[in-house]
A protein has these predicted regions:
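Structural beta-strand segments of beta-rich domains
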Residues: 47-51
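Short proline/glycine-enriched turn/loop motifs at strand-loop junctions of beta-rich domains
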Residues: 54-61
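The feature marks proteins involved in alpha-glucan
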Residues: 2-46, 80-175, 181
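Short loop/turn segments at connectors of secondary-structure elements within structured domains
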Residues: 57, 71, 95-97
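Short, surface-exposed loop motifs enriched in S/T, G, D/E and P with embedded aromatic residues
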Residues: 72-81
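Extracytoplasmic/secreted proteins and extracellular or luminal domains
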Residues: 53-54, 156
Length: 183
């Protein structure tokens, strides 16, 4: 039909939409943490978890975890074009359950990765992410946040967070899967 514009299917608030894709692609999506990662949601009458991960060079991605006995075929994700963000909703997944993304490369290799947007993870030596409910965290730092407004940050000590590359990279071909270093 000429002149007909097809509207995008109405997205749920937690789903990746066209604006999210645009802002993320521009590097200006300052709330992308609300979309990527694992989020406890209600989808109609079903409670579960909405998963989303950016994997632009993957042939396929699935979610594996305690809830599906780490089965790589149980929960495939859908590729959202044009940026290669993979998404899926899995009913019945609960808080504190462990999961990873199984990424299939174009050479057919399967790589298991922790969620870069996870809010909680298992302790080392394990590398799985954990589903958590950040909406119901009871913050107890009101006094500190109020005092912080009066500080001159230019004259205060600074903390630098180290993102550990070992959680995403391994030495290829090493049986012990040795961690990379910054050297």
């Amino acid at each position: 039909m000429r002149g007909v514009i097809m509207a995008e299917k109405k997205k749920k608030p937690y789903e990746i939409g066209e604006l999210d894709q645009y802002l993320f692609g521009q590097g200006n999506h300052y709330e992308i943490y609300e979309k990527l990662g694992a989020h406890l949601v209600q989808n109609g009458k079903q409670k579960g978890v909405y998963f989303a991960v950016w994997a632009p060079h993957a042939q396929a991605v699935s979610v594996v975890g305690e809830f599906n006995e780490w089965d790589t075929e149980a929960n495939p994700m859908k590729r959202e074009e044009p940026l290669g963000i993979y998404t899926c909703f899995i009913p019945g997944v609960k808080k504190d359950q462990m999961y990873k993304y199984c990424i299939e490369t174009y050479s057919g290799e399967q790589i298991f990765k922790a969620d870069p947007y996870a809010n909680y993870a298992e302790l080392r030596p394990g590398t799985a992410s954990r589903v958590t409910d950040i909406e119901n965290i009871k913050w107890t730092d009101t006094e500190w946040m109020t005092r912080r407004k009066t500080w001159n940050h230019k004259h205060e000590p600074m903390s630098v967070y180290e993102a550990h590359i070992g959680s995403w990279m391994r030495h290829p071909g090493r049986e012990d899967e040795g961690f990379y270093t910054y050297r």
